[in-house]
Amino acid sequence: MKINDFFAYIEEQVADCAKKERALIAENRKDEANMERIKSNVYGIAKSLCQVTEELAKKHGLDHATMFVDKLTAVMAPWKASLTAAKEHTDSEKECIELIKLETADRILEAWKR
């Protein structure tokens, strides 16, 4: 995916999450609204990582695509560890949060690779 298309995808997803969040709040569904906010935050993290890795790749003559995937994967590692801990401690709320973060990051990686 071209970088401008990727940024457009991210912005579209953030806007969609915000729209869903507002609708859920209006329906007094706060927990579900919080999940949309979490997704939006992950998209924001990915956008920031993409911008930073693009600059670093240019500066150091490295492959931007590989660098972005590596950095996003590194960000996901603590989420995976937290998910494992949540499962071990039967913390269903934390488990749900970590799953949403990881699923969103996986969607981002899939979009990036298109």
Predicted regions and their residues:
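Amphipathic alpha-helical binding modules
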Residues: V75-R114
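Short amphipathic alpha-helical heptad-repeat segments
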Residues: K2-K20, K39, A65-K80
